[in-house]
From Swiss-Prot:
A zinc finger (PHD-type) spans 268-318, 1093-1145, 1352-1403. SUPFAM superfamilies: ARID-like (SSF46774), Clavaminate synthase-like (SSF51197), FYVE/PHD zinc finger (SSF57903). It is found in: Nucleus. Residues 211-253, 1063-1086, 1244-1268, 1280-1327 are annotated as: Disordered. This is Lid2 complex component lid2. InterPro entries: ARID_dom (IPR001606), ARID_dom_sf (IPR036431), JmjC_dom (IPR003347), Lys_sp_deMease-like_dom (IPR013637), Zinc_finger_PHD-type_CS (IPR019786), Znf_C5HC2 (IPR004198), Znf_FYVE_PHD (IPR011011), Znf_PHD (IPR001965). Residues 121-212 form the ARID domain. Disulfide bonds: none annotated. A zinc finger (RING-type) spans 1096-1143, 1354-1401.
Length: 1513
């Protein structure tokens, strides 16, 4: 019951605020701080200190001391208590890191006045409150003093400073103000003088005059003035309230309750100083807090309302909660700098002092001399720092387990966070809130920051840990001089009482060591440096100051001496007599120590303390019962809180208390005797435990302490009774010893004996242990489970082990049940062996063997005769396994295991069953080899694989390999059926029912993954190639032969989109339209063009307005600048523009070739002949249908028998514009309309030429071969001339020949007849001219041969051969030529078995099929005087060379090259012919459109017989 109550209350306490887990590396460290002491420093003072003081004892800690701090403290407690304090030096290298973020850590400081009288600013704060209350009672309200130098004025310091130089009540003149400013260390300015004068005249002077005795006597004679509110007589007689609890604000009665008067008026309606709302035009509102002030009430006053934002002093300086005790907010770096400034200021005051190379003695003397000067001619020095701030409200400098769990020093025993919670610390045995003692306190101070004389709370020990910075000097008095020192303090400072000493654990006063020595005290001095500890004993007064910027952390601790020496009891008695609350209950600590059963507390002194406490409690209850015999006594429930305090002595009532109902209060039993009005009706007695329960607890505790002797007697009695005692009796004695936590030698010996006995018994149990007959589930086939079951005897133990252990049991010094069980097991084993030997005399069968082995398993031991039975049983089981053999279920591994088991079981090799099993294994291996050999081939035979599958049905083969074979066959059959279905569907008469090309592509991809190649797959591939050839044909129509196959569908979508706008039948002819972004402009006759508001379309593309628009000056049609590839930067406002419709010479930018409508119709017509449906069919149909409908729409206008008149010119322009914007070419209509427009409205000097094709104007991309050349040039494999060959002299001569060709062509075109007023050339004449020109081009002329010989090279280019060049030899003349010079590449060269050069080909009368590209840039036309008569080489037949057509025919049959084969070779080199003498990136097909050049490719693109055959192929 007692334990449950205490631990319930303990666990219900809060765990504190949650802390964020951090890493030590996240903090910023300042480099100039000291974190460790230097033990070799000569400045360590041991003797000859100032004032003749002796230095305190220093102890060097070792490694063992660092692991158990309380053991060290208990061992050295006498020394600590005798000296009052000692200093501890940790080992070298031991240092707890500072976890403060030294760059961002910020704290609110506490101001300190370096003065003997008082260190803190309590008097200043009290004076300010009295002054404020005095003026508020007279209607002058203010919340903070005026501001000087960004700091509020300290009224008390100002009053003391003025009183030094003048009498109270007198006025201030300039001389006095000057002295006061110097005394207060202020800047002597006019504004400062005005503020000081107003503060004195307005605030201090009236208060001091009213507080003077003469003024009080005069006021008592006068009548009491009338005031609005009703006050008590005591308040009227005392004009100055003594405490802040008395409110000077006027009150009124509202609904029967007292309330303040001022809140009845909202803030901002009356002045904060005078409390009046008069003269509202002079009231100024603060833009921060909306407070109102009269401009005349401000200090200093304002003459007018400021126009800009105005803030009161409370908002400007953040002093709405003014408290002179509070300092600024500091960071470590700024406080260190301020400390240096203060030290320099003190040096300037005493010019004789040297501030450089000061020792600690010099600084100590300097401190006391500065303190003496503060009481003379200078004002006391103001210091700031942090004194004993709880780390629960501010960050600690020590790592804790909650915030830094990964830091090793977080668990260090000497870490102040862990010290109060160590097991020996008595703070763990109090169930009250001891956070004021267990939470560490951080102190940070600048130079000379002082910690006044104080002692630890509740007579506990105190531990200081210097964290970083300069030295802190401490003065300590022994504990036996504490009482005398308290009397000395009270006599020296009568304003303080003994209650002040005990309430604050000291006074904020400074007593110099010299004064202490003069009065008979014996102080010691200790210099605490970084990383050092200072242990202060209980009841020892100590005082310290900082010799520079430094910081230390402190915490309380309590050892067993806290109770043993009566320190806690005496401390609580003192607090009780002074009615000062205490946080610890002496009774709760005693009971908690008793219930803990800690061996550290198992002493006679705790028994005496516990018995004395019970005696006092019993005496107090008996006294109460005598005074009030009929008083009701109730036992407290466990839910009643432990913190119940006495109303008189303010101490916690833990064991019992008296409660009064009216008025309700609690009184302890000790104070209850002093109550006069004790009666049974209004008082009740409550207790947690009665005397009987406490007595039982004391008896158990006494038995716990005195139990070891009793237990030893019991052990001796058991050992003397029997030489071999029972082991369970010894174990029972050991359990009792462990419950009592005994540590006697007998207990240790018995524990070792029992442990050895238990280990021996474990070995006996392991020997007697029988393996379980339940076996785990096995994945093996059933036919092998029986064999493994009887073949595995590893779980059976050897019987010799049992008899050996039985022999060792005779030497054991105890008896137990396990020894008897072992004897019985040995008897059973001997009996089983006899029965096993008798079974050999008769016949053995399978059942008999199984029964004997089962009995052996039950016993758990094996004997030599058991192996014979096991061998017989295994052979029986193997035969059963063979009979249960099935080929469909058994794998090759099972068959191999069967053979292995048979050999291990002793089955002869000539046994019929063994011979059959090995034969099956051999057949399985042959089958497996055949399968692997078949699968390793690139083309697998389906029939052979089917035979292997059927053969495996009667063999024991690898099931995975068999499944693979079956899977291949199933997939092949599935794909075969799928291909057959596709081929069957391809013969459908309805083209819509034929399969799509995607289905075919998917089927071919699936077939490629299989190693089986069937004839149906080859057939389907050929049909698929037909569709691909149709797609390539469509690509060539649009000039995209080198593009991927998918480009046809994409481009057809683009064509369909463009044609749907340009060839739209909804677009009807009409007058020119004006863009919406432009005003209407007149036409050539001054008429305004019609401008539609919506649906206006322009340009060839017949799309709405977009971007920059250009107007034609002839037809006034608007065009998109981007359609004409015109940049806005190159256009001028006054520039005139003629569209390509009006002037055919203006080029229209084309992104791709425009095929003829007839070619697209033919392409669409051939779709019906394809076996599969291309994806582009529907789009092609839409394009052809739209163009056909548009052509029918123009039939009437194009075939008008009366010709074109001027009235129909806009109509002709309209249709021609639509045709030019389309992506297909209407050849007849386009030529007709261009000729008619030129005839009616001629702009160009010559009529437009007849066009038969529409090529792209876009600069072509480099081909694959050209990209390879660029890469080889970049890598240095080819010279730069391969890309841009230099001009030669032959290139200059070429211009004359070109001009001759142009003249000849032009003369023929001019002589052509005219039809319908249009200059149309005869196509037949044109073709004939091209053929004649091609026939006149000969390479075998003597001039060309001579030029080659002059170059001393066999190639056309005349250049020398390099090792990197690719070359080929002619089979006739044996000349050597470069690949690129004769128009070859690697693919062509590999396909040609015999090569005939261009010269030999020309001499034999043949046509060289490839384009010549000499490296020197020479064009064949550049060579004059080509021979027209060619001698035929008798070695050559009708063909120039033979072609190895291995890439086109699988039979690889060599045949003679004919004109039809040229197309195939031309396709091999498609897109790689380069024009001579031009840039290497310009393909010949684009250069052929130029009017100034003519080449072989030009002739190949005309409609002669050769090109017709080429295009058809």
């Amino acid at each position: 019951m007692i334990c449950q109550l205490l631990w319930h209350e303990h666990n219900s306490m809060g765990s504190g605020r949650e802390k964020k887990i951090r890493k030590l590396g996240d903090n910023f460290s300042l480099p100039y701080l000291k974190f460790d002491c230097d033990h070799n420093d000569k400045n360590y003072r041991a003797s000859n200190r100032p004032f003749g003081l002796s230095t305190g004892l220093s102890v060097q800690l070792n490694a063992s001391n660092m692991t158990d701090p309380f053991k060290f403290l208990l061992d050295n407690w006498h020394t600590i208590f005798k000296n009052g304090a000692i200093k501890l030096l940790p080992p070298e290298g031991w240092q707890i890191p500072v976890v403060l973020d030294q760059g961002a850590f910020e704290f609110q400081s506490k101001r300190q006045c370096l003065n003997k009288g008082c260190l803190n600013y309590e008097k200043n704060y009290d004076y300010f409150k009295k002054l404020k209350a005095f003026h508020e009672s007279r209607g002058l309200y203010f919340y903070h003093p005026p501001i000087i130098g960004n700091r509020p004025v300290d009224f008390l310091r100002l009053r003391n400073a003025i009183s030094k130089f003048t009498n109270s009540g007198s006025s201030l003149n300039n001389e006095i103000l000057h002295k006061v400013i110097i005394y207060l260390r202020l800047e002597d300015t006019k504004e400062v003088r005005q503020v000081l004068t107003r503060c004195y005249d307005r605030y201090i002077k009236p208060f001091e005059r009213d507080s003077s005795p003469s003024f009080k006597s005069k006021r008592s004679e006068s009548s009491t003035r009338k005031i609005r509110n009703t006050r008590s007589s005591a308040q009227q007689e005392s004009p100055i309230p003594e405490t802040s609890a008395q409110s000077p604000v006027q009150t009124i009665q509202v609904n029967g309750s007292t309330s303040l008067k001022r809140p009845l008026i909202e803030r901002g309606e009356q002045c904060e100083y005078c409390g009046l709302d008069k003269n509202p035009e002079t009231i100024l509102l603060c833009d921060g807090c909306e407070a109102a002030y009269h401009t005349s009430c401000l200090d200093p006053p304002l003459t007018s309302i400021p126009k800009e934002d105005w803030y009161c002093d409370a908002c400007k300086f953040n002093i709405s909660d003014y408290d002179p005790r509070k300092g600024f907010k500091w960071k470590l770096s700024s406080l260190k700098e301020r400390s240096a400034e203060i030290f320099n200021t003190l040096g300037e005051r005493n010019s004789s002092s040297k501030l450089t190379n000061l020792t600690e003695d010099d600084i100590e003397l300097f401190y006391w001399s500065s303190l003496a000067e503060s009481n003379s001619g200078f004002a006391p020095l103001e210091l700031e720092g942090l004194s004993q701030a709880y780390t629960s409200t501010i960050q600690s400098s020590l790592p804790s387990k909650e915030v830094f769990p990964l830091e090793k020093y977080s668990s260090e025993p000497w870490n102040l966070h862990n010290l109060p919670f160590e097991n020996p610390c008595l703070f763990n045995y109090s169930f009250s809130d001891l956070s004021s003692l267990t939470i560490t306190r951080l102190s940070i101070g600048m130079v000379f920051y002082t910690h006044g004389w104080t002692k630890s709370s509740l007579s506990t020990g105190l531990l200081h840990h210097h964290r970083f910075g300069d030295t802190v000097t401490w003065y300590v008095l022994p504990p036996d001089e504490s009482d005398a020192f308290e009397r000395y303090l009270i006599s020296s400072y009568p304003q303080y009482t003994m209650e002040d000493l005990n309430r604050s654990n000291g006074l904020p006063v400074i007593v110099s060591p010299s004064s202490l020595i003069e009065n008979g005290f014996h102080p010691i001095a200790i210099d605490l440096r970084p990383n050092e500890f200072l242990v202060v004993s209980p009841n020892s007064y100590h005082m310290g100051f900082h010799q520079g910027f430094s910081s230390f952390e402190s915490v309380n601790f309590a050892t067993v001496n806290w109770i043993k020496d009566g320190l806690l009891n005496s401390s609580i008695s003192v607090l009780k007599s002074m009615r000062i609350p205490s946080s610890v209950s002496y009774e709760a600590v005693i009971i908690s120590m008793v219930l803990s059963k800690n061996p550290c507390f198992s002493s006679e002194w705790l028994i005496k303390c516990f018995e004395d406490m019970i005696a006092n409690e019993s005496a107090s209850k008996n006294e109460i019962m005598k005074l009030v015999p009929n008083i009701q006594a109730l036992k407290l429930e466990s839910s009643v809180p432990l913190e119940i305090r006495c109303s008189n002595c303010k101490q916690p009532c833990f064991l019992s208390f008296m409660q009064c109902h009216e008025p309700k209060k609690f009184i302890c039993l000790g104070d209850c005797v002093k109550e006069v009005s004790l009666n049974a009706t209004s008082w009740m007695l409550f207790y947690r435990w009665d005397v009987h329960e406490l007595s039982n607890l004391a008896e158990r505790f006494v038995s716990l302490i005195r139990g070891p002797e009793e237990w030893t007697n019991r052990l001796r009695s058991v050992l003397s009774t029997s030489p071999k005692p029972q082991l369970k009796v010894l174990k029972s004695l050991l359990v009792d010893a462990e419950k009592a936590m005994l540590t006697t030698p007998e207990t240790v010996n018995l524990r070792d004996f029992v442990q050895n006995a238990n280990s021996w018994i474990d070995s006996v149990n392991e020997c007697l242990k029988v393996a379980s007959l339940k076996r785990k589930k096995d994945k093996k086939p059933p036919l092998f489970k029986a064999h493994d079951h009887w073949n595995n005897t590893s779980n059976l133990k050897d019987s010799a082990v049992l008899f050996k252990v039985l022999q060792t049991s005779r030497s054991m010094a105890f008896t137990c049940q396990e020894i008897e069980n072992m004897k019985q097991k040995a008897f059973d084993l001997l009996e089983f062996r006899n029965r096993l030997i008798n079974s050999f005399s008769g016949p053995l069968d399978k059942n008999t063997c199984q029964r004997l082995l089962t009995e052996a398993e039950l016993l758990g031991f094996t004997i030599p005769e058991l192996g014979i039975i096991q061998k017989y049983l295994i052979q029986f089981e193997w035969l059963d396994m063979f009979y249960s053999f099935e080929t469909t279920r058994t794998t090759d591994s099972d068959l191999e295991r069967l053979i292995t088991y048979g050999v291990s079981a002793g089955i002869p090799e000539d046994n019929d069953y063994m011979i059959f099993a090995k034969a099956m294994k051999g057949r399985a291996e042959i089958w497996e080899n055949q399968v692997y050999d078949t699968l390793s081939k690139s083309n697998i035979s389906y029939d052979k694989l089917s035979l292997l599958r059927d053969e495996a049905m009667n063999l024991c083969v690898n099931k995975e390999l068999f499944s693979k074979v079956v899977g291949i066959l199933n997939n092949a059959e599935e794909i075969k059926n799928k291909i057959a279905t596709l081929c069957e569907r391809s013969q459908e008469k309805d083209f819509a029912l034929r399969p799509s090309i995607d289905e075919v592509k998917e089927a071919l991809a699936s077939a490629e993954k299989l190693p089986i190649l069937s004839e149906s797959t080859v057939t389907l591939q050929k049909m698929y190639d037909v569709v691909l050839e149709w797609i390539r044909r469509g690509k060539r129509l649009f000039g995209k032969a080198n593009a991927p196959l998918e480009i046809l569908g994409q481009h057809l979508d683009y064509v369909e989109k463009r044609n749907s706008a340009s060839l739209s039948l909804n677009d009807r002819p009409g007058p020119p339209m004006e863009p919406a972004s432009r005003e209407t402009s007149p036409d050539s006759e001054g008429r305004l063009t019609i401008r539609k508001k919506k649906g206006c379309i322009f340009c060839f593309c017949r799309l709405p307005e977009s971007g920059v628009m250009i107007e034609c000056e002839i037809c006034h049609e608007w065009y998109h600048a981007k359609c004409l590839k015109m940049s806005k930067k190159k256009l001028r406002q006054d520039e005139k523009f003629t569209c390509p419709i009006c002037d055919y010479r203006v080029e229209i930018p084309r992104l791709s070739n425009r095929p003829k409508l007839e070619d697209l119709q033919s392409l669409y017509k051939d779709v019906k002949l394809l076996p599969f449906q291309p994806k582009e069919t529907e789009t092609l149909r839409k394009v052809v249908d739209l163009a056909s409908k548009f052509r029918q729409e123009m039939q009437a206008l194009a075939h008008n028998p009366f010709g074109l008149t001027m009235a129909e010119v806009p109509l002709a322009r309209f249709y021609l514009r639509k045709m030019e914007g389309a992506e297909i070419l209407l050849v007849d209509e386009t030529n007709l309309f261009r000729q008619k427009l030129h005839e009616c409205v001629p702009i160009a000097p010559n009529p437009p030429p007849i066009i038969g094709e529409s090529k792209s104007t876009r600069k072509p991309r480099p081909t694959k071969r050209q990209r390879q050349i660029m890469k080889q040039v970049a890598e240095g494999l080819l010279p730069a001339s391969a890309i841009a060959p230099p001009k030669s002299s032959n290139e200059k001569k070429s211009s004359n020949n070109v001009k001759a060709v142009e003249a000849e062509t032009k003369s023929k075109s001019e002589k052509s007849p005219k039809k319908n007023g249009t200059n149309i050339s005869d196509a037949n004449n044109k073709n004939e001219s091209h053929v004649s020109l091609m026939k006149n081009w000969k390479l075998g002329s003597p001039a060309f041969v001579t030029l080659v010989k002059e170059k001393n090279s066999s190639c056309l280019c005349g250049e020398e051969f390099s090792p990197r060049d690719s070359f080929i030899d002619c089979t006739i003349c044996e000349r050597r030529f470069h690949y690129d010079c004769v128009g070859l590449n690697n693919e062509i060269a590999d396909s040609v078995s015999k090569f005939t050069c261009p010269i030999c080909m020309e001499q034999s009368g043949g046509i060289y099929p490839w384009q010549l590209r000499p490296r020197n840039g020479m064009h064949p036309d550049h060579i004059s005087g080509f021979s027209k008569e060619v001698e035929t080489d008798p070695k050559l037949g009708s063909s120039g060379y033979t072609l190895n057509n291995s890439k086109f025919d699988k039979a690889a049959v060599s045949k003679t090259l004919s004109a039809q084969d040229v197309s195939r070779l031309q396709k091999v080199s498609c897109g790689e012919h380069l024009y001579f003498g031009t840039d290497v990136f310009t393909p010949l097909g684009d250069m052929a459109t130029s009017a100034s050049m003519f080449s072989l490719d030009d002739s190949s693109e005309k409609t002669d017989a050769f090109t017709e055959n080429f295009l058809n192929v």
